[in-house]
């Protein structure tokens, strides 16, 4: 089974970027950086996401993946950022940046398409385009980079036809956007495992109820973490991804609950 903590990721975003989205209704002020988030939780794997407010910033000039203390062991970068993000003019993604960084930094293990399964995105990024992205990631360097997606329980609930696209990915990161749906996590995990050929899933763990724009209840937070631990131990998921550095320092009880949960994982 190995060390379960080695399977835990943090989703890291530019400080304050979520507070710029008024609909999230986040309290407080966020100053924590992604690397500080890793250090606070004492975990080693970072998934760096680009939001709309990061448009125009290249990863080569990104201060939030600079790791002077050696806190990070694995890194994933968004090939396509959040739903409001757009690539630089003349580009369709951040592939060139990712490959350039990966040549120098062996910690970079994957590229991820965030907020992917919207009709508008699937129309632009067809299965053929995704297959091309995957082939580049797998073969352009002296080692393969994995190709990950972000999927939500809402796509399962609506019955959206996403399978032709989803099967082009190596792994699905699965997220429960509305906290009330935590009560049906088994159903959504089964669906998430059906999306790729090998059924590989990293389970996303929200520390804020973004769907309802409010703090997640302590009961739902604990239930979500208990379920995640159970599936880590059973091997039904490859890992968990905590969301995110953007809500860890704004006074939410979920942060402390998660830290205590992590402290009991070996």
Name the predicted role of every residue range.
Residues 1-266:
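Glycan-processing catalytic domains of CAZymes
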